[in-house]
Structures are given as C-alpha cells and as structure tokens.
C-alpha cells in the first residue's frame, strides 16, 4: 500500500496530517477516510510510556499499519548503487588492526551480527544489510555457485554438533575461497 500523500508516507500516521489534507473532514460522526478509501479508527494510537527511550520521538514507535506500509514499500528489485564503486572497494580493502585486509569471515560476522536497532528504520536496515552482504559474498568476483556454496557451508557449520564443527573448521582453513 503506497500512500499518495507525502505526509502519510513519511509519518505513517494520519494524525500528523493537517486537516486540509484529509478528505471528508468535518463534524460528522462517520470515520475519516484516507485517499485509498479505507476507514481509519477514530482513536489515536497510545502515547509512549515516559520511561521508554523513544518517549521523546513518538514517530519512532511504528503502528502496525505504518510497519506494514513500510514493509510493502521496500524495493523488491536490485537497489540503485548509491555508493561509488571506488568507495566500496576502499571499504573492502580497509586494513585491519594488523595491517592486513579484512577477510570474508569478518564481513560475514558483521552481516550476521547486524540488528534492526542499528538502523534508522526498515529502508535503512535493508540498505545496510544489502551492503554488508555484498561485502561478505562479493558478487562482483564470485559466481552464483560459489556464493551458494558459501551459504550452504555456513548453514552446515551452524547445525553440526560441536566436535564435527571443530573438525570442519580445521579442514576449512586449508581450503579457502580467495577473493
């Protein structure tokens, strides 16, 4: 559901829309209708508790309707590349603490440890996850088969018992996908 009003799209709340922007405003007791024609509840969403960290920013607590709307507006196709290829290459070749390049394991850990709280909303989380996955999987230099192999090996390591995992990790250090 894409909102045609820019105010609805950015806030996700009809309460933040000026009265002149809403259709059907007046003193009637009928529920208000948005531009799509669905009925909106008359009660406003509950105010955040003062003890919560988001109390100062009421827009930070998404309503179920706003969360569903934001999820539906996420791009399904490839996102436009906003980072210059040179900057992306520099991010991949940034030396680590020992002066060596960061390896795929470092980028894999960054991808797996990313949390939604680290982002400023679903679109930013999507963008960051996409960038972290590109840094880890390197689709510019690896084939689809190599990427699938990396994902399957990681999942296998996650489900193996501890003893088998230790043997597999020792074997894996001998055979690495370079890139």
Swiss-Prot record:
<dbReference type="InterPro" id="IPR003309">
    <property type="entry name" value="SCAN_dom"/>
</dbReference>
<protein>
    <recommendedName>
        <fullName>SCAN domain-containing protein 1</fullName>
    </recommendedName>
</protein>
<dbReference type="GO" id="GO:0005634">
    <property type="term" value="C:nucleus"/>
</dbReference>
<comment type="function">
    <text>May regulate transcriptional activity.</text>
</comment>
<dbReference type="InterPro" id="IPR050916">
    <property type="entry name" value="SCAN-C2H2_zinc_finger"/>
</dbReference>
<feature type="domain" description="SCAN box">
    <location>
        <begin position="108"/>
        <end position="166"/>
    </location>
</feature>
<feature type="region of interest" description="Disordered">
    <location>
        <begin position="1"/>
        <end position="107"/>
    </location>
</feature>
<dbReference type="InterPro" id="IPR038269">
    <property type="entry name" value="SCAN_sf"/>
</dbReference>
<comment type="subunit">
    <text>Interacts with ZNF202.</text>
</comment>
<feature type="compositionally biased region" description="Low complexity">
    <location>
        <begin position="52"/>
        <end position="80"/>
    </location>
</feature>
<keyword id="KW-0539">Nucleus</keyword>
<dbReference type="Pfam" id="PF02023">
    <property type="entry name" value="SCAN"/>
</dbReference>
